[in-house]
Amino acid sequence: MKSYEELLSDIEEDMELMGSSHIVYSMEEDDIVTDYDYLPSDSCTISITLKELQEKLQLQMLYTKVSAHTAGADKNAPKLAVVFPGIGYTADKPLLYYTSRLASKHGYKIRTVSYGTLPENVKGDPEKMKQAFDLALEQTERSLGSIDWNSYGSILFISKSIGTVISSAYASRHDLTVKSILFTPLAETFSFPLAGSIAFHGTADPWAETDSIRKLAAQKDAPLFLTQNANHSLETGDVLTDIFILKTT
């Protein structure tokens, strides 16, 4: 059976050749897509557009990431999800709120990091950005210092923007085996090991250039999902489109 990454790569190639609205036929086992073909068959019976199939697979990947235990861990052990907000994108905003809800539904205890007061207007100012990173990481160390990481069967980091840098740095510093959901990561995020990570980026994000993020993600073997014309909040400015993005991210 093909991996999610292999299926998504095939879909991207087919979308370039035939268009996103081209109809294909998917093979599913227990509502999980396992393959697809261009013509219906005994195994591939569900008609679906390439775009819809891509979005369904992305959602499946996210569910798999959230629901699974860490390899080799005690499946009866508790699970912990830690939320790392952005500077202005707090934990009660849509991407973090709904992902946390999803994690909670799958049995994770939710913990949110608070950075305290950080420098403002950091975009385009490397000195302020480094200061914000150092302060946020220091507060993260204090906030999470009492956690016995070995007591959890699965650890999930849910992060946004500068939070993706903080979460990746923290996991690396403490040699933690974690799964990470990286919403709108910065280039600096990819300075750290990202095994077990999945990333989401908008092609109109003014904080991170798409080609650069694509290359960096490929270097780290981190699955990257692009939302066309979406900004740093993965929003497009069109309400109906933004609701659709939330449903499929």
Predicted regions and their residues:
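Acidic, low-complexity, intrinsically disordered interaction modules
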Residues: M15-S41, S47
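Gly/Ala-rich beta-loop-alpha elbow adjacent to hydrolase catalytic centers
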Residues: I158-S167
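Short beta-strand/loop motif that positions the catalytic acidic residue
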Residues: A199-H201, D205
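A conserved short beta-strand
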Residues: L176-P185
